[in-house]
Amino acid sequence: MDVLNAPPTPAVSVSPQRDYAIFMQVVRYPPISDVAQPMLRLAGIRIDTNTNGMHMAPYYISYAVKRLADGDDVKVAFPQDAKMGPPVWSSDGKRFAFTNTTPHGMELWMATTATGQTRRFDGVVVNGVLTSGGGRGGPSSIEWMADNRTMIVRLVPAGRGAAPLLPAIPAGPHVQESLGHAGPAPTYEDLLGTPHDEDLFDYYATAQLAYLDTSTGKTTPLGTPGIYTLVRPSPDEKHLLTGRLHHPYSYQLPAGSFPQEIQVWDRSAKAEYTIASLPLADRVPIAGVRTGPRSYDWITRKAATLTWVEALDGGNPLEKVPYRDRILSHAAPFQGEPVEAAKVKERFAGMQTLDNGKALVEDYDRASRIVRTLEIDLDKPGSEARVIFSRNERDAYRDPGSAVTKTLATGRRAVIQTGDEILLSGAGSSPTGDRPFVDRFNLATGKGERVFQSEAGGYEAIEAVLDDSGTRLLTRRESPVETPNYFIRNGAELKQLTHFANPVPQTAGVKKQLVNYKRADGVPLSFTLYLPAGYKAGTRLPALLWAYPYEFSDADTAGQVTGHESQSFTQLNYHQLGVLQGYALMDNVSMPIVGDPDTVNNTYVEQLRMDAQAAIDKAVEMGVVDRDRVGVFGHSYGAFMTANLLAHTTLFRAGVAESGAYNRTLTPFGFQSERRTFWQAGDVYTKMSPFWFADKIKTPILMIHGEADDNTGTFPIQSERMYAAIRGNGGTVRLVMLPSEAHGYRGKETMEHVLYEEMNWFDKYLKP
């Protein structure tokens, strides 16, 4: 259990000036008492009623602040028993704010970077519903203004009173209806179901925006209370881009689909311009987008120019159109009509503005899985987009990386650019594993120059680029025998910044290697093989096979190696701990399903069988695995895989399926990458569903599921009904339901019990 609960390497956040870093320690598995806190499940959101924040929002228990120039520590007085959100830096990097979650609410704190002095803002209670921590570019409870003194915060409204009580007598029946218009939707969880649910959602999600003067601690209300999805100052800070949900709500869709008003305000909350009054998005095509404006933002390097995207195909990816989306812009004072800046042939997937009026735009073709990076000129409406990169989304070897950004004085993130050159940073996937890199790339010539790449045999991840040339980096270095630590790299020169001790000396001697092979039809595959410490060559061990299937358009991309498991430090995740109990572990086993994206699942079972057969054959050929003592296990779609392998093969002696979906007729509008509905491809849904073959599962299977699963499609009833089907047909099966746990298990006691259950199961059926 010591290895299971060993602390992970701290995460890092670098200041906007790139001169300080905060190393943030997370608890790998918090206590079950955290997981079991009271919550409401409303509109697809899990709300902690004690804190008025997100239930089980990630938190840090400590920060360590370092000056990057000399590595000196800055002592900071943080709250006792802290549960801190991520730091939110002022644009000058002299201060950072953070929330601290207490049993009674979310506090707001601020620290001075150079001195470590901290203060709590008394009387400020943050509303953490509909937010994701902090930082510009995403929903946040905290937004710094460029004066580095003022913040916009979302507060629990003062004097709002107690939460609405469930009426003792129902007001009437709960009614839903649809009047003949198609509206397919995934099987979302945690939706609204009654008028009382609506009242509770309004109560907890409603926030009061306010300006907070960090010098005095005084708050000034901004506008009226509302359910805000967005508040973002313009670069010149004369305007605020806001989004606000309103009724009528849906009982079939989560909050992100509710009606929404997108407006520009002045600094006093007076509406200046309405971008869109979006209706309920209840008729969005499968894999489509809602019509009307979306992806709205400010253009980073302009004073106050809006940009947003609109679909030209009705949001339907099946429509044949010359252009699928258009990008519009509108400058203050927002008079006249918006300008159509550019059109893209495929679905818009993101934009980063450059410093010359141009922008990098990504679009994605659903039919071919091709993702492109385009250069467009926002200052020349109607000009043709120029293709910079184009590749299959699964083609990791050709991934050019992402543009590196830095923080401007306005607090906005912008692409680092010197003339025509930008910096790109990526995973660097290769046949030997990931080798992260930084490139200097010329947009005019299309030529790149490699500035840095992680050496083979180890793993050096790029955590931050510390200068505009890309030569000074903050990296995290590790190897199978080297504990992860942070370094400052300046070209070839390395300076160690942290000295974290080995948290898991128990893993010393565990061997691991990347293994490459092919399946029967020639598709290249791989897995990472773990062998116990002291393993003697030629000894055949009982083995555990852990995998998760993915879909690919072609064999070349299906066979690519991704990840850095074989080069990284051997800390071991929970599913890998069998190697400490005498098992060989075949980890991250390739399970590709290859074919046309529209019909790839027609041969799902056949390909899955070939994948598993090839992996076992290779391990047996190497002389390390006993063919007659192999177990298979996986989580979510990996659990689905496990049940299918036990239903359709005799390759395994036992299986463990965590939080799976086994009857695909209960996810009738598509699942994973399946694009067809049940009514279009009922035979495929049936053939892929192990529930329909429960009578064939005679290999012992342990099924585990969180009672509060929140993942689309994997309702707990999937495991409950699968257990009943196998039991009813005379199979050997055990069902373990985990109280309070969601799709991904979090609680310390939960993880210890899961490990106990799985090791006992495999020991019983795989060991002599």
Residue ranges and their predicted role:
Residues 3, 262, 306, 388, ...:
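Conserved hydrophobic/aromatic pocket- or pore-lining residues that grip, position, or stack substrates
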Residues 498-539:
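N-terminal cap/lid segment of alpha/beta-hydrolase-fold proteins
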Residues 548-553, 562:
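Active-site glycine-rich loops that stabilize anionic/oxyanionic intermediates
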Residues 265-270, 333-335, 365-368, 376-383, ...:
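Secondary-structure transition/capping motifs at alpha-helix termini
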